[in-house]
Amino acid sequence: MSKVKKVVLAYSGGLDTSAIIPWLKETYDDCEIIAFCADVGQGAEELVGLEEKALASGASECHIVDLKEEFVKDYIYPTMASGAVYEGTYLLGTAMARPIIAKAQVEVALKVGADALCHGCTGKGNDQIRFESCFAALAPELQVIAPWREWEMESREDLLDYLAERNIETTASATKIYSRDANAWHISHEGGELENPWNAPSKGVWTLTVDPEDAPDKPEYLTIKVENARVVAVDGVELSPYDALMLLNEKAAAHGVGRVDITENRTVGMKSRGCYETPGGTVMVAALRGIDELVHDKPARKWRDQVGQEFTHLVYDGRWFTPLCGSLLAASEALAKDVNGEVVVKMYKGQVTAEQKRSPNSLYSEEFATFGDDNVYNQKHAEGFIRLYSLSSRIRTLNSKK
């Protein structure tokens, strides 16, 4: 333990990381603590006074790194282009943020000459795996410290007592029962009443979106332009990836879009329940799927679904910095180049639907698909196809009658 001289801590200013700073100094022979905070769009209010708080807790420096644009452009957009959705519902909001945070933390550690990295993830969750897998891929020479797997404290009350004994102020309290994680893409809510799956989430759980029952009685429509499976404009206004997401977050949240309540399978083996709010992301996914339906044939969509599922588990399980990630992204981008066009989405009472869609790469032909008269499709041709398509079934039945 005495060998650790300088540690870079992934710091949020919350209860856990506020307690970790003095614990590190006490446990590792008064080592130097560098606090690192990644701005991934969790909200400006979360960053106010953060540096002062870190220094007051015992850190010698606090590095706040703006990663918002990079996060959306290089992590969220490629993941959504792949069609990744965990267990049919979860849009990977927490999981997608971990690799960029870990990468930036490693960069700070190498810059300041640290010999260890530290995170505040619990020993029960997925995040410890995600962070440490990234650390192993990017800087295996650095020691990793995970206080929740080392110290004897077991509850929020223990942490509050620990800080009180050292006269370190915190805004946390035993009554703040939910564990939340926010970024530009989403906010997650866990703990408290949600730990019993028979309990419906109370109104106090949700913080980002309007209750669908209280949403406007009139729907709102947006025209979304997509290029290479990326949203590039909304209602004719070209926007950066981050600005597009922020606008869609605002619009969709007002209509209660993007709420999910799921019980998921964690990488560590247990099930956990989470309530997630992903308003803008839910609209983006609806728009991308609308274009995807037009431009990809059956084999391409089947392949995209396979790639998406593989990429889903790669992101969820913390394997971003691996050769497999590069391979899956390459496959995804090969299909994404055709996902171009415009979609009109309708947002109403918690729902979003793609009402209108068009693409220069569309494989849909009204001439062929019409139920009316046409001069391009000879329906008699279907007979020979069906005989060949069903040949194995025909042979199987004939053989059974011999």
From Swiss-Prot:
Cell compartment(s), UniProt: Cytoplasm
Pfam families per record: Arginosuc_syn_C, Arginosuc_synth
Reaction catalyzed: L-citrulline + L-aspartate + ATP = 2-(N(omega)-L-arginino)succinate + AMP + diphosphate + H(+)
Pathway: Amino-acid biosynthesis; L-arginine biosynthesis; L-arginine from L-ornithine and carbamoyl phosphate: step 2/3
UniProt: L-aspartate binding residues: 122, 126-127
Positions contributing to ATP binding: 10-18, 38, 120
Alphabetized InterPro entries for the sequence: Arginosuc_syn_C, Arginosuc_syn_N, Arginosuc_synth, Arginosuc_synth_CS, Arginosuc_synth_type_1_subfam, AS_cat/multimer_dom_body, Rossmann-like_a/b/a_fold
PROSITE patterns per the UniProt record, alphabetical: ARGININOSUCCIN_SYN_1, ARGININOSUCCIN_SYN_2
Protein residues bound to L-citrulline: 90, 126, 130, 179, 188, 264, 276
Record-level Gene Ontology MF annotations: argininosuccinate synthase activity; ATP binding
Main location: cytoplasm
A single Gene Ontology CC term: cytoplasm
SUPFAM superfamilies in alphabetical order: Adenine nucleotide alpha hydrolases-like (SSF52402), Argininosuccinate synthetase, C-terminal domain (SSF69864)
EC number of this enzyme: 6.3.4.5
Keyword Nucleotide-binding (UniProt): yes
Subunit structure: Homotetramer.
Similarity comment text for this entry: Belongs to the argininosuccinate synthase family. Type 1 subfamily.
Protein name stated in the entry: Argininosuccinate synthase
